[in-house]
Amino acid sequence: MNKELEMKKEIIINRIIDFSFVLGVVLVLFPHFSKDYIPSFLFPFFGSDKVLSIYPFFVFSLFSLLLLFLKKEYKKLLFIMLACLVFCFGFFVIAEHGLFMIIDGVTQYDVEKLEGSRLSFFNIVSRLFDSKDLSFRLSISEGLFALYSAFNQFKEIILVALLIGFIYKERFDEAKRLFFIGIIISFILVILYEIIEFPFLWGSEWSLKIQETINPFFHEVYRDGSWWPPLIWQDNVLRNVFAEPSFFGYYLGFTTVAFMHLLINNKHKVLWSVFLFLSYLFAFLTNSRSGVMLVLGGTFVYCILFAIKERKINYILAILLILALAFAGNNYVVRIKEKNGIVTAYSPIEKTNTVVSPLDGNVFEVLKASFEPDDIVDSSIVRTIKTVFSLNARSNTTRYGCTFAELSIGLNNPLLGVGELYIGGYMEPALAEAGFSNGELDVWIQSQKQNGVLNNSFASFNAFTSTFADGGVLGFILDYGLLFSIIVAYIILFFRRDGFRGYKISIMLFSMIAIIIAWGFSNSLQESYLYVIVLGLALSDLLSRGRLLKHDETKV
């Protein structure tokens, strides 16, 4: 009787876990959701976080921990506790070290510039230790805030990834199925939004009005008094429900790899071909350098690994054909926009009063022109990719300037860095030493002077150099130790004779991890919760593989 009751409990808990997992995958579409529509009572524990996936994965984490406890998996629970302690203590040391390096220059003016939870911690500490000097009170409050921030980061990233790995180790096939369900549902939502957004590329007024109405739900428009994210992206490109086109491109990098896997390994190949085509087309129409590069890079990695391990060229040719059709479709859309006189980031045409429908009589001429060699050589996509390597193109001066400055700061403080909260005070001399300067950087420098040494007014464009500058080698290991351990495990697996053969899901996950690494060189990895989900699935893949090998099985 007790066993039956325990089994029923486990079944119910697993269903809650699975539902939370699928919902979390679907909600990766909303990494900057407006906090006006999130219950305020959640803010103290979640820090008013606008990444919607965090909330279902919090439920996932609670019930996963409960399941491990009921199954008496005490070693795993102890491992999680020790990992949390090491993670939090490590970032506490980094924060205290960073504050110690600048404490002599901190004034009351700097303290008055503190905001949010940092200010709350300082006020509480000041009441408890009102007789102590400023340096003492600040060191206590900043240390407490570092522990608070580190714990939140651990429970939202490391804990979720570990629990996905542990919980789905025994039923990895179910994890794969749930992941694809979540991706498919999210992509259907993307398509539904594109029914509204796509006509805007041809100057549709009704499309504009609908977007103006619904976009404030998806992200906080003009957040904190800045221009970003705007209500409507003025470059006449796709961004869907995301705050900017590059974030949409990041998401599409994952969907292209997922749909390649489904096309090759599942039925309904026409459906997956259409979804793959749309993923490519949407990515091209974002006109995002990083988005296009991620989609093409993910395709390249997947096709190379598949060709080496599976030796089935026909599928690769099918994928390349779909890619070529999407490329032509992009050029067709661009030509229609040019005929409409719509000014875009890559189409400097003067505005006219003539609106051309994509279904006009000249559709075949336009489509034919989309395949012309001259058009391909000088297409918007090629021009977009070229700007990645130009120092003066778009935001590259700012991007490369901050990246080289962070690298310099990290090399000068290699062990513990300078502290995430205090790096702003080091940026101006580092930028000057690297020889980077422009109007945007000058604005941040002036803002840094106004906000004081306890704040950081500079944006980060490279997750790895930023982490290295903030926390040195220790911070890098704490943040990315799990990620690079999984990469090493997959590489070792790849070079085994039977490596990925039969493990096609490993090819997909490794390709997604390659996308994550590439994205990290231009943005924060946390811009999409797919980072955490893919880490967890990869860990589950590796753990389940080890379990199966013990039983002399060879397939996942």
Predicted regions and their residues:
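A membrane-periplasm/extracellular boundary helix in multi-pass inner-membrane enzymes
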Residues: 97, 198-201, 306-391, 408-412
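Long extracytoplasmic/lumenal interhelical loops at the membrane interface
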Residues: 389-412, 416-474
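N-terminal signal-anchor transmembrane segment
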Residues: 2-107, 530-537, 542
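Loop-to-helix entry and N-terminal half of a specific, functionally important transmembrane alpha helix
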Residues: 19-27, 270-278, 314-318, 454-462, ...
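Helix-loop-helix junctions and helix-breaking kinks within/between transmembrane helices
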Residues: 35, 50, 96-97, 148-152, ...
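Aromatic-anchored transmembrane helix interface
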Residues: 50-58, 108-167, 178-181
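Transmembrane alpha-helices of multi-pass inner-membrane enzymes
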Residues: 23, 60-65, 299-300, 314-317, ...
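Alpha-helical transmembrane segments of multi-pass inner-membrane proteins
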Residues: 154-163, 177-235, 239-309, 513, ...
